Amino acid sequence: MPVHTLSPGAPSAPALPCRLRTRVPGYLLRGPADGGARKPSAVERLEADKAKYVKSLHVANTRQEPVQPLLSKQPLFSPETRRTVLTPSRRALPGPCRRPQLDLDILSSLIDLCDSPVSPAEASRTPGRAEGAGRPPPATPPRPPPSTSAVRRVDVRPLPASPARPCPSPGPAAASSPARPPGLQRSKSDLSERFSRAAADLERFFNFCGLDPEEARGLGVAHLARASSDIVSLAGPSAGPGSSEGGCSRRSSVTVEERARERVPYGVSVVERNARVIKWLYGLRQARESPAAEG
């Protein structure tokens, strides 16, 4: 039977004018079937037509229930655990706690130590208190225990620092002796030998550069000294062993700054030295040719 068939006694559709009846679709003009009865679902329609496609009589007579998800029926907590969680815990009320009584003797001794002024003898012994920190405090004479209301707050005040002692003034000997440099100290003999060796090497190089000793002696000491005066002056204060010894003794009594100030800087470049050597050789040549021109 079609669903849209009207049942007898169903209320008819309301009367509409002709011009509206021709324009409205027919399915809108029909009233609800079975007086507004619910439309069967697809499962119900299949259940009604089961005999058409099921051959077994047992299956046709049984009704299939909708599938429901499996729910875990086991409780999350055991009854004992739930009972212990839900029931309020009854703890035994602790008895009246007894506070430790204050030792009034120790408290009074602390008050006396903080209130008493520090004597100068104790202030002078203040640096040594760190060594005897583990020693017990000196015993104080017993006093009658004061009442609880007489106990006042202990204010710990820092001890006054001991006055700084003035540094002893250095003696006249210490003031007169100059400060020695902390570096390596060389002996006088080592320094004099070093300066004399450097002076001898420098003098040998400039006096006999390109000349044999016999040829230099043949030219004469006066010509040699006159020609090489501007070159030998490079030796500075270390021109001979005697002067180096005197300079060494003088340098040993001055500080590092004065020694650096007195040191002669050798700022002569290589070009200037070569020019002086060429000039010196040229002077030797002129000194050699002058006796030949006079003879």
Swiss-Prot record:
Q: Per the record, a Pfam family?
A: FAM110_N
Q: Keyword check for Cytoplasm, yes or no.
A: yes
UniProt lists compositionally biased (Low complexity) regions at: 125-134, 236-253
Keyword line: Cytoplasm, Cytoskeleton
Which tissues is this protein detected in according to the database? Detected in thyroid, lymph node, trachea, adrenal gland, bone marrow, spleen, thymus, prostate, and peripheral blood leukocyte. Detected at lower levels in stomach, testis and spinal cord.
User: Pro residues compositional bias: what residue ranges?
Assistant: 135-147, 160-171
- Coiled-coil stretches: none
| Residue span of region Disordered | 117-192, 236-256
Q: Which GO terms describe its biological process?
A: mitotic spindle organization
Q: What induces it?
A: Up-regulated in stimulated lymphocytes.
* Cysteine pairs bridged by disulfides in the record: none
Q: Where are the transmembrane segments?
A: none
Q: Which InterPro entries match?
A: FAM110, FAM110_C, FAM110_N
User: Where is this chain's protein located in or outside the cell?
Assistant: Cytoplasm; Cytoplasm, Cytoskeleton, Microtubule organizing center, Centrosome; Cytoplasm, Cytoskeleton, Spindle pole
Where is this protein chiefly located? cytoplasm
- Family listed: Belongs to the FAM110 family.
Name-wise, this protein is Protein FAM110A
- Which organism is this protein's natural source? Homo sapiens (Human)
- What lineage does the source organism belong to? Eukaryota, Metazoa, Chordata, Craniata, Vertebrata
Please state the gene responsible for encoding this protein: FAM110A
